[in-house]
Amino acid sequence: EKYLTGMTPKKILRRPGPSTQPDWGQNLPPILQRLYAARGVTSDEQLSYTLKRLASPMELRGIDRAVQLLATAIFEKQSVMILGDFDADGATSTAVAMVGLGMMGLERVDFRVPSRFADGYGLTPGIIERLRDEGELPDLLVTVDNGIAAVDGVRVAKELGVSIVVTDHHLAGEVLPDADAIVNPNQPGCPFLSKNAAGVGVMFYVLTALRKHLREINQLPDPQPNLGSLLDLVALGTVADVVPLDHNNRIFVEQGLRRIRQGEARPGILALLEVAGRDHQEISSTDLGFVVGPRLNAAGRLDDMSVGIACLLADSRDEALRLARELDTFNRERRTIEKDMKAQAQDLLASMSLDLEGLPWGLALFDTDWHQGVIGI
C-alpha cells in the first residue's frame, strides 16, 4: 500500500450484513432482500417512516438540563442568542431554533453565524469578545451544529456570565467544554441510538423535549406549537450534511419531503426550488442535496451565511424569492470559481514532471490564491 508522505493512512472497511437474514417470504424479490440486508433492515417496522417511529428525545444525554435552561429563558424573558455554522446544516439548524423557540413563546431570540474568513469555525473567544464589545452578550447562548469542541469559547462566555447550551452532532474530543448543558448523541455516555443525527436533527429533538415539558406544566402557548412544520428544514439539513440515512434520519427526510411536495414548506425552500427550475411537487432527496443545498451553502462559501438563514426565515414569497435569487447568484459565482480552480490545478499537474512508476495513490495541490470557501468541494 502506498500513501502520501506525512498523511495518516485510512482503510476503507467493508461492513458485513447481519449474520442471520429475516424470512421475507416469496413475495419480496431477491434484489430487495439483498438491499435491505446491506442497509441493516431486518423487519417491516424499519420500513415504516411515520413520526411515531422516531427515537425518544429523552434518550439524549443532557436534554433535561437544556430544556430547563430554555424554559427559564422563556419564563424570565431572557435574551437568547443562537450561534450557527456556515454550512447548510448550520443554516437549517439556526432556522429551526429561531422558529421553534419563537413558537414556544421565547420573545428575545436572535442569531449569529461566524464568518468562515474572519472568525473560523464555531464558538470562539473572539466571537464572545465581539458580542461583549457590541453590547450584545445574551443571557443564554445556544450553539447549533457546533460547540462540542469550543472549550475556550465556552470558558470565556461563562467568565462573562453567559449560560451555554451546546447542541451538536460532531465527535467529541478528549476534553468537553464546560457548558451548562450539552446535547450531542456522539458525546461520551449518551445512549441515543441514532449517532448519525445531523445538527438540525439534534436541535429538533431539543424542541420536542421542550414542548413536552411545557405541556406537562401547562405552559404551552396558544396555539400549540406544531413542530411538524419544521420537518422540511430538518430534511434539508439532514440530506445536505450527507449524514448516513439510518432509520431515524429516513423518517426525517421522508416526512420533510412530504411537506415540501404538498407545498407546505417554508417560503425560502420553495423559492430556492423555483429559482432552480424545480417543481416542488416532484422533488426527491436528490434535489435537496444537489439543488437546494448548494445554493444555500454558496452564501457561507463566498460571503455570509446570514443571507441563507434569512431566506429560510422569510415569511413572504416575495422576500424569499429575492433572497433565493441572491443565493442563486452566489452559487453561479461559486461554480465559476470552482471551474477555474480545477483548470488551474489540471494545468499545474500537466506541467509537472512525474515518475509514473513511483506515484502515490493521490496528489495534493496547493495555491495560496485559491478561494478558501470553495477549495474543500
Q: Model-derived features: where do they sit?
A:
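N-terminal amphipathic/basic-hydrophobic helices that include classical n-h-c signal peptides
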Residues: E1-G6
